[in-house]
Amino acid sequence: MARLRLLLRSARLLGLVALGLGLAAWVSLRERLPGADVTPLRQRLTRWWLARLCAALPFEVRVSGEAPRQPMLWVANHVSWTDIPLLGALAPLTFLSKAEVRAWPLAGWLAEKAGTLFIRRGSGDSRLINQRLAEQLHRGRNLLIFPEGTTTNGESLRTFHGRLMASALEAGVAVQPVAISYRRDGVPDAQAPFIGDDDLLSHLGRLLRGERGSVHIQLLEPIPSQGLDRAELARQAQQAVRLALFGTAAPTQTRRAA
């Protein structure tokens, strides 16, 4: 049964990848036209395609709360690469990703064509990065970041780093905290986390072979940035996500990922 699930789901996913490549190539051609601004088209197509990708993944998705109508800096806890399509299907988002993702076969190219902003961790040029992020927010675009800086197994929360929160302050926009929880058979999902030495294809294979899990996405109360510094903004966002996921007793990890 697991083998049949893998074959059927893989076939559906391959069809979606082919469709995504075709759409990305078409947008890339449109981009070359003189004076063409394809950003609105790219965001609409990206959201449409991500919604179909989510439907092909083995998750039952439940969403609490409403997506904001005005541009905000979305900050979420990070469990897996699947966080990105799940959130991207909810609203037009510009994604921020580590530079290594650009080198992933197919997925990296699709991410680039979807308008993802890539940053190199440890580059030290936080001012320039925040300027790029603030520009996106000034243009009325929602921006998604994962302030933990890495993925977790979903059973704890790492410290939210305030370095990238400065973009919300510079643009004068609120922060939209998001809590993502993966469950399977009533307990935290051990298959969903993309951590450690996982590679994309092996992780995807495990997901496609398994039974359907569940995902709960909570869009929490936005946090106004006015009057706060980036450290306090990060602390409040982290507290909101921690309370939504675990309640007051949940621990926060402070160690860096291995």
Swiss-Prot record:
Top-level division of the source organism's lineage: Bacteria
Gene Ontology BP terms: cellular response to phosphate starvation; membrane lipid biosynthetic process; phosphatidic acid biosynthetic process
Transmembrane segments: 7-29
Keywords: Acyltransferase, Lipid biosynthesis, Lipid metabolism, Membrane, Transferase, Transmembrane, Transmembrane helix
One matching Pfam family: Acyltransferase
InterPro entries reported in the protein's UniProt record: Plipid/glycerol_acylTrfase
Transmembrane recorded as keyword: yes
EC category name: transferase
CDD domains tied to this protein: LPLAT_AGPAT-like (cd07989)
Localization: Membrane
Record flagged with keyword Lipid metabolism: yes
Induction of the gene: Induced under phosphate limiting conditions.
GO molecular function: 1-acylglycerol-3-phosphate O-acyltransferase activity
GO CC terms, sorted: membrane
Enzyme Commission code: 2.3.1.270
Catalysis: reaction(s): a lyso-ornithine lipid + a fatty acyl-[ACP] = an N(2)-[(3R)-3-(acyloxy)acyl]-L-ornithine lipid + holo-[ACP]
Membrane topology designation: Single-pass membrane protein
Effect of gene knockout: Mutant shows no significant growth defect.
Pathway: Lipid metabolism
Cross-referenced PANTHER family: 1-ACYL-SN-GLYCEROL-3-PHOSPHATE ACYLTRANSFERASE, 1-ACYL-SN-GLYCEROL-3-PHOSPHATE ACYLTRANSFERASE-RELATED
Annotated function: Catalyzes the second step in the formation of ornithine lipids, which are phosphorus-free membrane lipids. Uses acyl-acyl carrier protein (acyl-AcpP) as an acyl donor and converts lyso-ornithine lipid (LOL) into ornithine lipid (OL).
Family assignment from sequence similarity: Belongs to the 1-acyl-sn-glycerol-3-phosphate acyltransferase family. OlsA subfamily.
Full protein name: Lyso-ornithine lipid O-acyltransferase
Native species: Pseudomonas aeruginosa (strain ATCC 15692 / DSM 22644 / CIP 104116 / JCM 14847 / LMG 12228 / 1C / PRS 101 / PAO1)
UniProt gene name: olsA
